[in-house]
């Protein structure tokens, strides 16, 4: 979910993240200072979150709410990890140079006895 806070400085960002850190169900949060928004991921009640932020900060508006699905997030993270692993393996692969070795000392040419 995305909550508009109207916060554009580091000091206020610290206060807001500290105030929401005690709420149960928050898996991760990110504060975008350019847009002044707070992005929260987890199984937290949006009404409870906005009420808590308004009580402590004064202004908060819920702009986007998408229900959090932990299984879906886990699948996305697993797919990303597999993709990164494949890319890492591709970096370590290289084309081996095939060399033909000739030994002139033991020629099997025409021998007349």
Swiss-Prot record:
UniProt key word Mitochondrion: no
Domain (HMA): residue spans on this chain: 1-65
Lipidated residues (S-farnesyl cysteine): 110
Designated name of the protein: Heavy metal-associated isoprenylated plant protein 15
Species: Arabidopsis thaliana (Mouse-ear cress)
Keywords on record: Coiled coil, Lipoprotein, Metal-binding, Methylation, Prenylation
Tissue expression notes: Expressed in embryo sacs.
Protein family: Belongs to the HIPP family.
Proregion positions: 111-113
Post-translational modification Cysteine methyl ester, affected residues: 110
Lineage: Eukaryota, Viridiplantae, Streptophyta, Embryophyta, Tracheophyta
């Amino acid at each position: 979910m995305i909550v508009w806070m109207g916060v554009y400085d580091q000091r206020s960002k610290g206060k807001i993240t500290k105030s929401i850190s005690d709420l149960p169900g928050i898996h991760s949060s990110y504060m975008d200072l350019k847009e002044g928004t707070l992005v929260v991921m987890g199984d937290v009640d949006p009404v409870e979150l906005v009420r808590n932020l308004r009580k402590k900060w004064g202004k908060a508006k819920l702009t986007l709410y998408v229900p959090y699905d932990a299984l879906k997030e886990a699948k996305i993270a697993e797919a990303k990890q597999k993709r990164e692993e494949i890319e890492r393996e591709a970096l370590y692969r290289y084309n081996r140079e095939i060399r033909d070795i000739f030994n002139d000392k033991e020629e099997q040419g025409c021998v007349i006895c």
